[in-house]
């Protein structure tokens, strides 16, 4: 009975996210999405003179300097853009001191980005990862793929609770054969991933979306508190009223931001 109730609650949660994200994506965010990522799935076509209303970011300053007139780069659109939503489902994302956990925040972002991409006519894919890739849905068009992505973000259990952002980047390097737009959703509590993430960003358009909980930025001085790492299982009692302990916690928090 509890399992049935849990499934029903999960489906209601997916439905609420779908309704909210559809509204935001169609009424508020779709124009910003199209404007922000125009060019991510485009091929260069030719140069032409700047006209009022053209986007300034497409101005080619080298050609402008040579011609003494303002020129922009004109693009021709590829058949479609592949959008990959990458979500960290490691143990640390189950934490949340407010109404929603970081995992549930990730589901909200997945819904918003997924439906925005769908309304823009783009394909949407999903990669869930922890220590390694846990689930990969290849890019496809249609709302059903977005709804499934939301459901998987909320329900998929990691094979290992630890985090390896580098393993996710390496998987994408091998799996994506064409330039894609990648939304990378994580709390980025990991070490030594900067090089592989930077290499991925050289081949694709990567947008990092950081999941941050207020308690991870500032812990109140409330005396002795037992902390447990949800990924390693290590636990320790810390006196949060101790100034040295507060300094150490603040330093650790800044390390991951």
Question: Where in the sequence are the language-model features?
Answer:
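Von Willebrand factor type A / integrin I
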Residues: 1-36, 42, 46, 54-55, ...
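Acidic, polar low-complexity linker/tail segments
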Residues: 12-85, 89-97
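DG-centered beta-turn motif at the end of beta-strands
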Residues: 61, 87-90, 126, 172, ...
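…and closely analogous acidic/polar surface helices at protein-protein or active-site interfaces
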Residues: 76, 93-123
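A short, flexible beta-alpha/helix-coil linker loop
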Residues: 90-94, 131-134, 243-245
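Von Willebrand factor
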Residues: 145-180, 192, 213
């Amino acid at each position: 009975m509890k399992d049935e109730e849990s499934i029903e609650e999960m489906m209601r949660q997916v439905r609420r996210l779908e309704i909210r994200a559809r509204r935001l994506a169609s009424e508020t965010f779709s124009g910003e999405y199209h404007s922000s990522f125009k060019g991510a799935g485009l091929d260069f076509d030719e140069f032409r003179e700047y006209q009022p209303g053209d986007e300034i970011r497409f101005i080619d300053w080298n050609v402008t300097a040579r011609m003494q007139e303002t020129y922009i780069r004109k693009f021709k659109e590829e058949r479609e853009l592949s959008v990959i939503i990458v979500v960290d489902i490691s143990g640390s994302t189950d934490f949340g001191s407010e109404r929603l956990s970081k995992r549930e925040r990730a589901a909200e972002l997945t819904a918003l980005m997924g439906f925005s991409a769908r309304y823009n006519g783009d394909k949407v894919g999903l990669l869930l990862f922890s220590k390694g890739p846990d689930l990969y849905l290849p890019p496809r068009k249609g709302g059903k793929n977005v709804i499934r992505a939301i459901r998987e973000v909320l329900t998929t259990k990691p094979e290992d609770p630890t985090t390896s952002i580098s393993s996710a980047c390496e998987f994408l390097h091998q799996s994506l054969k064409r330039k894609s737009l990648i939304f990378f959703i994580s709390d980025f509590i990991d070490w030594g991933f900067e090089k592989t993430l930077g290499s991925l960003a050289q081949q694709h358009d990567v947008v990092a979306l950081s999941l941050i909980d207020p308690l991870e930025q500032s812990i109140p001085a409330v005396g002795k508190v037992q902390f447990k790492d949800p990924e390693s299982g290590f636990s320790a009692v810390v006196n949060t009223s101790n100034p040295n302990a507060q300094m150490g916690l603040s330093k650790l928090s800044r390390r991951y931001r």
